[in-house]
């Protein structure tokens, strides 16, 4: 069984909805177990992360980067880095913000660099760019490095972030789970 862990921070609930979509996508791949871990619980669940075949990172984009709580957690993984505990695990990332750009690429790049520091194997979005104006197409924000979603500056809900962005996240989760399963053999 392939094990996928999703570590995320959500300040207002939007990124949690996206994390749940990513988890649904990963769980849709037969023989996959998924652990959804809020970043506040990640240190306590380090054994779950160490046992995972893949770790997917999720954070809102705040001021052009990962959120403070997510960065704080990243910095707590120094001992894991030193021992290369996550070497050759699959990695991927997703982010959400209130604007179409919002410098989300920088957030994904920060996650990618973090994964590279841990000698992980990054999996891209793997979906051709959709039409940004069409709120129903996959990958409407044209991200190649991971899932990008946009939320209205309103309460998080079943439609905020959009269904298309949630479906894009689900596709990322399924892609990561498929790679983890292949890697596991």
Give the residues covered by each predicted segment.
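N-terminal beta1-alpha1-beta2 submodule of the flavodoxin-like/Rossmannoid cofactor-binding fold
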Residues: 1-86, 135, 153-185
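Short glycine/proline-rich, acidic loop/turn segments that cap or connect secondary-structure elements
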Residues: 135-152
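Generic hydrophobic/packing signal
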Residues: 18, 30-32, 54, 96, ...
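Short, glycine-/small-residue-rich phosphate/pyrophosphate-handling segment
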Residues: 90-140
């Amino acid at each position: 069984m392939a094990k996928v862990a999703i570590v995320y921070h959500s300040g207002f609930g939007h990124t949690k909805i996206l994390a749940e979509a990513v988890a649904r996508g990963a769980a849709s791949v037969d023989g996959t177990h998924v652990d959804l871990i809020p970043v506040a619980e990640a240190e306590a669940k380090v054994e779950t992360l160490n046992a995972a075949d893949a770790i997917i990172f999720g954070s809102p984009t705040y001021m052009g980067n990962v959120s403070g709580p997510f960065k704080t957690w990243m910095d707590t993984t120094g001992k894991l880095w030193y021992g290369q505990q996550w070497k050759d695990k699959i990695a991927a990332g997703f982010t959400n913000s209130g604007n179409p750009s919002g410098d989300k690429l920088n957030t994904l790049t920060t996650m990618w660099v973090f994964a590279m520091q841990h000698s992980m194997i990054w999996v891209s979005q793997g979906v051709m760019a959709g039409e940004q104006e069409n709120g129903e197409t996959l990958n409407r924000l044209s991200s190649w490095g991971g899932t990008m979603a946009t939320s209205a500056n309103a309460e998080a809900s079943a439609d905020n972030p959009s269904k298309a962005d949630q479906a894009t996240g689900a596709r990322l989760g399924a892609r990561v789970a498929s790679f983890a399963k292949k890697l596991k053999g």
